[in-house]
Amino acid sequence: IAYFSLDNPTTIDTILYLYVIVWAGRLGIFLFRRINKDGKDERFDKAKKKFFWFLQYWMGQAAWVVFTAGASILAILSPVEAELEVIAFIGIFLWWSGFLIEVISDYQKRKFRETSDPKTEFISTGLWGRSRHPNYFGEITLWVGMAVISLSSLSGVEYVTAIVSPVFVYFLLVKLEGVPMLERIADERYGELSDYQEYKANTPCLLYTSDAADDEERV
């Protein structure tokens, strides 16, 4: 809506708009395919039993959309007619890096689930051998890129939104919902497996290591 309210959108406005659309479309298709195949989203199994917990998750998702896209929306609506500069290209590089990491890690996880039983086996190959949550690493990097692209179109206090957006994504995924939930589920399923204990001890939560973990599948 913000983009189509403009009379003469700049190149940066168009890039921000298209990147948000691509991100939302890709994520929507991915989640639909996963839930359609599994019949549920196990992350919310326990929460659905308690109304206020489930409401909290939905409120968190709504806040996530607003805060993560905040910098992009303000940049699109900004009267500053910014041109593509070096900082914008840095942001574009970060966005594509994060997007590709997220897409590849989601694909690797999906292929693993098609050939393995996730209730007894865990993925530790590919990008998942370098990070326990490479998809979240990609998501955070993607939004850092969006914030950097937005900088050229922001001014004054608006710069704060460029910082708030990726910081909010980080805390939501790493401290509040994503990682804590998935780590708890993984610990319950595989906590007694020595291979899982070794994997968790030697593989960072987000940041990649220079050497991948053992490429042999751990079960």
Language model features: what each stretch is:
Residues 1-18, 69-91, 148-161:
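Helix-coil boundary and interhelical linker segments in multi-pass alpha-helical membrane proteins
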Residues 11, 15, 42-60, 86-89:
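Interfacial transmembrane-helix boundary/kink motif in multi-pass membrane proteins
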Residues 21-37, 67, 93-112, 165-186:
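Transmembrane alpha-helical segments that form the membrane-embedded catalytic/substrate-channel core
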Residues 33-49, 107-128, 183-207:
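Cytosolic, membrane-interface loops and tails of multi-pass inner-membrane proteins
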Residues 58-73, 135-147:
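Core segments of transmembrane alpha-helices
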Residues 86-145:
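Aromatic-anchored, glycine/proline-accented short structural segments
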Residues 127-177:
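Glycine/small-residue-rich hydrophobic helix-like segments
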Residues 208-213, 217:
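Conserved small/polar residues in nucleotide/adenosyl-binding loops
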